[in-house]
Amino acid sequence: METNTARKTILVVDDDPGVLDYASYVLEECGYAVLTAPDGAAALVLLRDHDQIDLLFTDVVMPGLDGVEVARRACQESPRLKVLFTTGYAADVIPAGRLLKKPYRPEQLAGEIAAVLANST
């Protein structure tokens, strides 16, 4: 499943350990470097500690800091950071941004990540 990723780094954030493991496995198989966080607070620490994160892939609905707030804070610090949201809930839970609905297949995740990374805006 490896793609031409130029070793981009993806931060995956999800409070469901099974989803976190699944997404990180799929992305590692695609050739990405992957960091994981089980919640929004841990994600913000990783974002501060690793300045080479190319994309934030975050669940929207999590206890504590939700994915929308994590993305807002992260993009304030790193305006070029790409963001892809995911949720099993209705798409209207995010104000704006790209969304991958759960459950997703490996090829859907890989395709959405590649598309977001390729988008220069």
Stretch-by-stretch model annotation:
Residues G31-P38, L46:
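Short hydrophobic/Thr-rich beta-strand motif most characteristic of the beta2 strand and flanking loop
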Residues P38-A42, D66-V70:
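Acidic catalytic/metal-coordinating carboxylates
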Residues M62:
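Receiver (REC) domain active-site loop signature in two-component systems and cognate sites
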Residues D59:
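Active-site residues of response regulator receiver
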Residues R48-D51, R73-L81, Y89-V93, G97-R98, ...:
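Conserved phosphotransfer cores of two-component systems
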Residues D21-E29:
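Charged docking surfaces used in two-component/phosphorelay signaling
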Residues Y104-T121:
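C-terminal output helix
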